[in-house]
Amino acid sequence: MKKKRKYLFIDILMLIIMLGGACALLYPLVGDALNNFWNQQVINYYQEKSNAENREAIQQEEKRIKEENKKIAKMGVPGNDPFTKKKPENTTLEKDYYQKHTIAVIRIPKINVALPVFDQTDNLFLKRGAALLEGTSYPDGGKGIHTVITSHRGLKEARLFSDLPKLKKGNHFYLEYKNQTFAYKVDKIQTIEPTEVETLNIVEDKNYATLMTCTPYGVNSHRLLVRGTRIPFSEGMKKTLAKADRVHRNRSLAILIFSLLLMIGIGSIVFKRIKSLKVRKRS
């Protein structure tokens, strides 16, 4: 009897370890895939809203942005570091709240990133997507522009900017703003202290966009900056983005299907094992 109980305990322990291991393996993959689906809904809403605007509304918005960027250029000081400043965190989780604060879309095909860009840099938004660093330029096609887009790295439930270090000089990334798409070619990659904000200053005759996240991984004492200079958006780039969008969606869908099948398989094994244990216990 004692021997049977011992084997029963070992069997139950192995089943628990198997389930725990599967959950630990799948959690970051499934979490990221679900976050991607959620972000895609926010992006779709933003795109539909932008496409529905009439020409007069678009022209008024373009005028407002140019005036806002002129004010930002005169101030010449980017906002505080979003990863160290203490700011009250809104706990609202409704999707329409995020949709209301979405001002752009960042796409980085090289690392399979497509995220909504929010207008505030508090942790609520940074855990979901990317954000425009306060005090930096709105995306625009003119000169004297330096847009800074920031996001988290290393979250278990979402990759976000985790793969940003994989970008190299010459790679492209894109910002969708209203009904326009701006293309950027990476020309500078550097690591700075959180206080070295002068690196993000506007250069009078240039149009830059910088992607910012924490580094080193797990330590987060410094900031990784990947700067791109604006280049013309071509028809070939449009095709690249369409292909990257399909890959992005298919990858997330494949992860969810694989995870579901794996859990069904493990569940089947566990069910059969429990049934077998009950039979052994009766005998």
Each language-model region and where it sits:
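Short, Lys/Arg-rich, polar N-terminal cytosolic tail immediately upstream
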Residues: M1-K4
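Solvent-exposed, non-transmembrane regions of membrane-associated and secreted proteins
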Residues: K6-N250
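C-terminal single-pass membrane-anchor helix
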Residues: T240-S283
